[in-house]
Amino acid sequence: KQFFQTGNNLTNAVALSGGSEIAQTYFSYTNTDARGVEPENKLQRNNFDFHEVAKFLDNKLTVDGNVNYITQKLNNSPAIGFYSNPLTGLYFFPRGMNIAPYKNYQVPAAVGGNGAPTQNWPFIEDVQQNPWWIINRNTNEDDRNRIIVNVAVKYDFVPWFSLQVRGNVDRTDDDGDQKYWAGTLAPLAAPNGNGSWNGFQQTLQQEYGDILGNFVIPVSTNLKIDGVVGGSITDNVTSGINFGPGAGSGYGLFFPNLFTIQNIEVAPAVALGGTSGSYGSNVRTDQPYHNQVQSVFGNANVSWKDMIYLTLSARNDWSSNLAFTPDDHYFYPSVGLNFILTKMLSLPQVISFAKIRGSYSQVGNTASQYQTNPVNTASGSATVLNGTAPSSLKPEQTKASEAGFDARFFNDNLTASFTWYKTNTYDQDISIVPLSASGYSSGNVNAGNIQNRGIELTVGYNLINHGPLTWNTTVNYSKNVNKVIDIDSKDGINLVDLTPGNNNYDTYVSKGGQYGDLYVQTLEKDAQGRLVLTPDGNGNYFPVQGNGELNGYSDVGNPAPKFQLGWNNSFTYKNFNLNFLLDGKFGGQVISVMQGMLDYYGVSKVSGQARDKGYVSIFGEDQTTGKTVTEIDPKNWYTFIGGRNATLGQYVYSATVVRLREAALGYNWVVKGSAVKSVRLSLTGRNLIYFYRKAPFDPELTSSTSNSLGGVDVFNQPVARNFGVKLNLLF
């Protein structure tokens, strides 16, 4: 309570529209001013949107233009993990001490030092710092300017054919930095104690253009054909510079807390992987990237008596990322078929509508950039890096099949929708280090056949649908089964580590398993399931580390749920409306590195309870005598299983969670005889109540947007309960 604050998000928007039959104009402005639950975490955003549509030549020519401009400033984006994260010091702080004096996060410079203030904190270790020091002296800032311009020109030559040309430019300029002030502990700041500074300036620009021929052919009264043929080009350019030695590089600032490029230490090339005697600089690094995709495509929709619908599509892409390979292009078709049973068959009157559907599709994806030919990379020295990939890389391909039905009953009061699907993704682009027998340090290969199979079911019913009161309830059910059919058998690769270098866990893709299976260290057990214990010589015991099946680690599950269930209810009564959504994810496993460290430091609730009792209850076996042991010393237990290298097999939790996801209450006023036509006031809430949760954190939170870190808690940000008020005025 002494550190966190109440976050808020204030959004104001105004929109104007007007026009005639010939031209329509739309303009809007949205301002967002937000602050997070951590102090100094702020976001400011302005969004301007202008849209104009005009028709000429007896409405045959349509010109459509849109400009969207966004400015954004983000300060102190919250961190996860051990470093630059105020939660570590906050959570590790002893419960018997008063943290309030440390809000004064810095103290005057020490005699004989560099003259810079130092950090006011009683503990010296790399995984924790003063929380207020981090938010004020380990600051980060990101400024963004983005402009999106869309132009489309369409001409209707005849009633059944039109030609359209479209163009789009999307440019984003980012300018950001991370400052580590003198007094910050290693490895974030330089060993010389003067602090460090890292920054970047980056521009991403995408240019897109296409030409489309749209046709509608009424072959007969019963048979209709419509579709589109065309081609497109997408060009992406990324450029920018980075400056600064980087946290943990061993280099920093010449003079303390002077954040200028001229004050950044220059590292010798040998420190950057170059050769002895060469010159280098880690002040600036150019990052030019350029790729292009050229495409031709077409699709056709055929309908018969508005009861049978056939959809066909085909697309071929040529990608610059596949240059120097035998297959620089990839073709992917699709087909879909729908039958409207209520028009084809004489069904009971209770069936208002019934449709069955099925489809098959292929989707292609290009390889990673600059992976098909050796390139010279400037990395602060004259050294040419030797990472590459073979010229036999192929595009990734996903094949998907789907079938289902949609139905409505009792005058549309009861609705049901069901979908079965199966997807297989082949030839995924993965990095292999080292790339054996190639002469290069690393490279990419095509690998994998990852399958997803599942079902989705939605059932809704209007329980009350007459008079001033209505009530609609909807239930959603979904289930997905993931399986790694193959990785790269032809090259003898049956396992890929997605998280190499982690302290005490790994996520793997292994043949026969699921994507992102969690592997951790576990404790050894005997045939009866008892923990194997070794005496400590003082009448107590230590557990014994197990020998996992993969590099000492054991498979403890996957964070993906077995199934998901949601229940939504919507009520209206005159001008009032109420909505609430309950949902749950059932099954799966997650792990908490944070809980292991809190236990090790003795600041968790369970470690405190164990100290009060004087023991931890276990089911173990003395490996020297074979006798059953039911109690173990808390210090021996938590110092062995906890800490940064925790035995995470003891910190595996069910990922099942059931919550009141959101609720909203609104009221509408209709105003007469005023410039204001209507007023709507809404009260909203999200993450309101947990009905069931066993994990010490929200299982839906991840340590990264990467798929490889799902279900892993490494001092993730706490979940916030959100309340909102929204006012809409229509003039």
Describe each model-derived feature in a short phrase.
Residues 1-17, 22-30, 104-156, 269-299, ...:
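Outer-membrane beta-barrel transmembrane strand signature
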Residues 1, 83-133, 181-195, 239-282, ...:
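Surface-exposed loop/turn segments flanking beta-strands in extracellular/periplasmic regions
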Residues 20-107, 141-175, 196-244, 314, ...:
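Transmembrane beta-barrel strand/turn architecture of Gram-negative outer membrane proteins
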Residues 395-439, 478:
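Membrane-embedded beta-barrel scaffold of Gram-negative outer-membrane proteins
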Residues 186, 319, 585-680, 685:
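Extracytoplasmic gating/loop element in the C-terminal half of outer-membrane beta-barrel translocons
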